[in-house]
């Protein structure tokens, strides 16, 4: 029989939240505002990227639709459906093509293909027939080569890694291997530091590179931050001050780090304490501004709120990467 006179734990304060913030509770914190509703359905939105004309492209992973959003009118159109299963990221090449990473069967059939903004003229860049990668995300460097993340593995089975593909798309060089579900990836403004999120072990990697872009500098591979909670860090981007913005999947927020990997701020989705809009996956800046767009969905809340883009102002203007150079 319970003794009512014993000290008793109660749900008060932070413990009342569906996704409590403990270690980062003292950080500068803002709450995002609704920007565009993509769908009334719960879609796994991902892959935010802008073209040279400032139009936003994104996708939903499980149905494979590629969307385009006009920031001026907030009009949403479906451009095409991915020819490959489970697309996970879009990056715009300087020539205007969309490079689309796809996860395939989440085991051995992922890859990257390039296409036009209408989904025409498909070109295999990393073929799912010739590799065992499960490719989640990529980032171009100024030479036109790119780094990509291999999304394979589990917390106790680190099969994933990070690789570099030369500008001619013929040579693939490993950067780091034996990590678990490599996910988001970003490159510093001087291209000397590569950031990688490792989802199922809740880690942030900071990789200092030598001038060749593939050799890790002495003592250059570090883990400056360990995240807490379920599920973990997802896609990321940088601003022009080299701050890193990391979406926290399953937590309804984005954490912001300075160029040394120290947390300096966070962005919350409305309703997160009640378990709403928790699947934050990708932050991205509107070109030439400090306005940050964040995609999320309400699948964990029976899709009540659908699939949304939210917005806030970041610390600095977004960094205009390869497609704008």
From Swiss-Prot:
<protein>
    <recommendedName>
        <fullName>Lactonase drp35</fullName>
        <ecNumber>3.1.1.-</ecNumber>
    </recommendedName>
</protein>
<feature type="binding site">
    <location>
        <position position="133"/>
    </location>
    <ligand>
        <name>Ca(2+) 2</name>
    </ligand>
</feature>
<dbReference type="GO" id="GO:0016787">
    <property type="term" value="F:hydrolase activity"/>
</dbReference>
<feature type="binding site">
    <location>
        <position position="183"/>
    </location>
    <ligand>
        <name>Ca(2+) 1</name>
    </ligand>
</feature>
<keyword id="KW-0963">Cytoplasm</keyword>
<keyword id="KW-0106">Calcium</keyword>
<dbReference type="GO" id="GO:0005737">
    <property type="term" value="C:cytoplasm"/>
</dbReference>
<feature type="active site" description="Proton donor">
    <location>
        <position position="234"/>
    </location>
</feature>
<feature type="binding site">
    <location>
        <position position="128"/>
    </location>
    <ligand>
        <name>Ca(2+) 2</name>
    </ligand>
</feature>
<dbReference type="InterPro" id="IPR013658">
    <property type="entry name" value="SGL"/>
</dbReference>
<feature type="binding site">
    <location>
        <position position="108"/>
    </location>
    <ligand>
        <name>Ca(2+) 2</name>
    </ligand>
</feature>
<feature type="binding site">
    <location>
        <position position="110"/>
    </location>
    <ligand>
        <name>Ca(2+) 2</name>
    </ligand>
</feature>
<feature type="binding site">
    <location>
        <position position="46"/>
    </location>
    <ligand>
        <name>Ca(2+) 1</name>
    </ligand>
</feature>
<feature type="binding site">
    <location>
        <position position="136"/>
    </location>
    <ligand>
        <name>Ca(2+) 1</name>
    </ligand>
</feature>
<dbReference type="InterPro" id="IPR051262">
    <property type="entry name" value="SMP-30/CGR1_Lactonase"/>
</dbReference>
<keyword id="KW-0378">Hydrolase</keyword>
<dbReference type="InterPro" id="IPR011042">
    <property type="entry name" value="6-blade_b-propeller_TolB-like"/>
</dbReference>
<feature type="binding site">
    <location>
        <position position="234"/>
    </location>
    <ligand>
        <name>Ca(2+) 1</name>
    </ligand>
</feature>
<feature type="binding site">
    <location>
        <position position="131"/>
    </location>
    <ligand>
        <name>Ca(2+) 2</name>
    </ligand>
</feature>
<keyword id="KW-0479">Metal-binding</keyword>
<dbReference type="GO" id="GO:0046872">
    <property type="term" value="F:metal ion binding"/>
</dbReference>
<comment type="similarity">
    <text>Belongs to the SMP-30/CGR1 family.</text>
</comment>
<feature type="binding site">
    <location>
        <position position="235"/>
    </location>
    <ligand>
        <name>Ca(2+) 1</name>
    </ligand>
</feature>
<dbReference type="Pfam" id="PF08450">
    <property type="entry name" value="SGL"/>
</dbReference>
<comment type="function">
    <text>Exhibits lactonase activity. Acts in cells with perturbed membrane integrity and is possibly related to the membrane homeostasis.</text>
</comment>
């Amino acid at each position: 029989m319970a003794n009512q006179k014993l000290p008793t734990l109660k749900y008060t304060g932070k413990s009342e939240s569906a996704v409590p913030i403990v270690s980062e509770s003292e950080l500068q914190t803002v709450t995002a505002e609704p920007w565009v509703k993509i769908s009334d359905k719960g879609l796994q939105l991902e892959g935010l990227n802008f073209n040279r004309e400032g139009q936003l492209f994104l996708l939903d992973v499980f149905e494979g639709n590629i969307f385009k959003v006009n920031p001026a009118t907030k009009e949403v159109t479906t451009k095409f459906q991915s020819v490959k299963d489970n697309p996970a990221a879009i990056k715009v090449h300087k020539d205007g093509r969309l490079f689309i990473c796809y996860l395939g069967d989440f085991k051995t059939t992922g890859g990257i293909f390039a296409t036009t903004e209408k989904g025409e003229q498909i070109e295999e860049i990393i073929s799912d027939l010739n590799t065992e990668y499960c490719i989640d995300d990529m980032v171009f460097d100024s030479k036109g080569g790119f780094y990509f993340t291999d999304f394979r593995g589990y917390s106790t089975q680190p099969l994933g890694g990070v690789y570099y593909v030369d500008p001619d798309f013929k040579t693939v060089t490993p950067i780091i291997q034996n990590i678990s579900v490599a996910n988001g990836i970003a490159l510093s403004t001087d291209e000397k530091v590569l950031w990688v999120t490792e989802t199922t072990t809740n880690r942030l990697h900071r990789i200092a590179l030598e001038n060749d872009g593939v050799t890790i500098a002495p003592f250059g591979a570090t883990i400056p931050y360990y995240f807490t909670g379920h599920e973990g860090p997802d896609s990321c981007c940088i601003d022009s001050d080299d701050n890193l913005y990391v979406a926290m999947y399953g937590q309804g927020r984005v954490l912001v780090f300075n160029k040394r990997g120290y947390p300096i701020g966070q962005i919350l989705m409305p309703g997160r304490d009640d378990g709403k809009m928790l699947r934050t996956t990708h932050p991205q800046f509107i070109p030439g501004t400090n306005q940050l767009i964040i995609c999320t969905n309400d699948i964990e809340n029976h899709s009540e709120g659908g699939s949304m883009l939210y917005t806030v102002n970041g610390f600095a203007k977004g960094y205009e990467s390869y497609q704008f150079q």
